Amino acid sequence: MTTSSTTAPIAQAHGRFIRGSVSKVRRVLDQIRGRTYRDALIMLEFMPYRSTGPITKVLRSAVANAEHNLGLDPASLVISSASADMGPSMKRYRPRAQGRAFQIKKQTCHISIAVAAQPDS
């Protein structure tokens, strides 16, 4: 018995070692997951968060990959998955009173976005 599944082609892009905490990036990714490419770009343009810049860059890269590698039309693309994982933290030290030093962790994250052709309905 053979089963044939018609899955939509998926293009993805990754942004690694992006400065910013994972929780702040996930807050934005949760808003755009499942939306069309055009809707996501409009939302990202007007959101008041600093993490929208790198997310927009990764999203445009994923759409460019879909257009160049798979020949898909950008108008028909939907964000099928968007995730952020924790990257390494850069450790810095802040001088404090009486010779002490406090550690400051500058967090990084890895952003992954996958786009797929919108299913015909």
Curated annotation (Swiss-Prot):
GO terms for molecular function: rRNA binding; structural constituent of ribosome. PROSITE patterns: RIBOSOMAL_L22. The keyword Transcription regulation does not apply. Keywords: Ribonucleoprotein, Ribosomal protein, RNA-binding, rRNA-binding. CDD domains: Ribosomal_L22. GO terms for biological process: translation. GO terms for cellular component: cytosolic large ribosomal subunit. SUPFAM superfamilies: Ribosomal protein L22. It comes from the Bacteria. Pfam families: Ribosomal_L22 (PF00237). InterPro entries: Ribosomal_uL22 (IPR001063), Ribosomal_uL22_bac/chlpt-type (IPR005727), Ribosomal_uL22_bac/org-type (IPR047867), Ribosomal_uL22_CS (IPR018260), Ribosomal_uL22_sf (IPR036394). NCBIfam families: rplV_bact (TIGR01044). This protein binds specifically to 23S rRNA; its binding is stimulated by other ribosomal proteins, e.g. L4, L17, and L20. It is important during the early stages of 50S assembly. It makes multiple contacts with different domains of the 23S rRNA in the assembled 50S subunit and ribosome. The globular domain of the protein is located near the polypeptide exit tunnel on the outside of the subunit, while an extended beta-hairpin is found that lines the wall of the exit tunnel in the center of the 70S ribosome. Part of the 50S ribosomal subunit. Belongs to the universal ribosomal protein uL22 family. HAMAP family: Ribosomal_uL22_B. This is Large ribosomal subunit protein uL22. The lineage of its organism: Bacteria, Bacillati, Cyanobacteriota, Cyanophyceae, Synechococcales.
